[in-house]
Amino acid sequence: MHELGITQNIVAIVAENANNRLIKRVTLEIGELSAIMPNAIEFCFDVCTQGTVLEGATLEIIKIPGLGKCRQCATEIPLEQPFGICHVCNSVELDIIQGQELKIKEMEVEELSV
């Protein structure tokens, strides 16, 4: 399960950028073609955040659908797997233009009290 290592890296990156403030929420974008299982990330998040500034934070995952572009006719095609056939010209030469990403889109931190 490579999601554990990925989640550990996410927690480390967010904690590093939190400047010792508590994190309330983390939003990730995970592409549906990325081979990353959002359910596993959610499970690992609870474990990996224990004892950190992220402990108790909410994890929000936005799934990004797969999208390919035909090299022959430039048609954009929705993809459920990292390959497919253009429904316009029947070419199998597709470039994946969306759906492989893993991004930390946003983090919400507790406000500093003065």
Curated annotation (Swiss-Prot):
A GO molecular function held by the record: nickel cation binding
Binding site for Ni(2+): H2
Residues holding Zn(2+): C70, C73, C86, C89
Top-rank taxon, per record: Bacteria
Keywords: Metal-binding, Nickel, Zinc
Nucleotide-binding recorded as keyword: no
Signal sequence interval, chain numbering: none
GO BP annotations, alphabetical order: protein maturation; protein modification process
InterPro entries according to UniProt: Hydgase_Ni_incorp_HypA/HybF_CS, HypA/HybF
Family statement: Belongs to the HypA/HybF family.
Function: Involved in the maturation of [NiFe] hydrogenases. Required for nickel insertion into the metal center of the hydrogenase.
Protein name, per record: Hydrogenase maturation factor HypA
Species whose genome carries this gene: Trichodesmium erythraeum (strain IMS101)
Taxon lineage: Bacteria, Bacillati, Cyanobacteriota, Cyanophyceae, Oscillatoriophycideae
